[in-house]
Amino acid sequence: MLNYIVWNANPVLIDWGIQVRWYGLMFAIGFMIGYEIVARMFRHEGAPERWLGVLLIWTVAGTIVGARLGHVFFYEWSYYSAHPLEILKVWEGGLASHGGSIGVILGVLMFSLFTSKRSPLWTFDRLVVPIALVGGMIRIGNLMNSEIFGHATDLPWGFMFVRSRQWMEMYPGQAVHPTQIYEALCYFALFALLMWMYWRKNAEKRPGL
């Protein structure tokens, strides 16, 4: 009996001329669910309906631009500096969640400054709930990409990421911790806690909580 899991998932879900990658799909699903969560919060608090659309534009634009530029500058600058037009091909993959986080922060600041005229904390208090969910979805995308794994392990749930060149270079023949799964579970648990705090503990009445 093997004491490890061989992970050979294809990061591309559909390839019909234009690729649909698992990472991008997880990002999109998280966004759609997050939109509905924030919409319910806004209705619950009587916030102007148009705010939701404006916030969506700012956060989507900030996330996509930030995630793309984060990947470009942090991971593949040598390639994209020589092929700058390739930066525009977001549909081919190459997004970094930390870059997306920076983009969201900037988007919220713009929304607060030009639309809501409220403290950015008011908006962040509502966005952190779906962001925790999106974080978990993104880590599932990382799992499908065979990236962001942990150190070597002999535990029975260790993964061998056979599609990963980095794994082959760093841990050839060794199982590693599936840290994507660990993080995803933590994000989903945080999401559940934040949902409970908002809807059951009236956390919306305590800005910055």
Language-model regions: role of each:
Residues 1-209:
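A feature for loop-to-transmembrane-helix boundaries and adjacent hydrophobic helices
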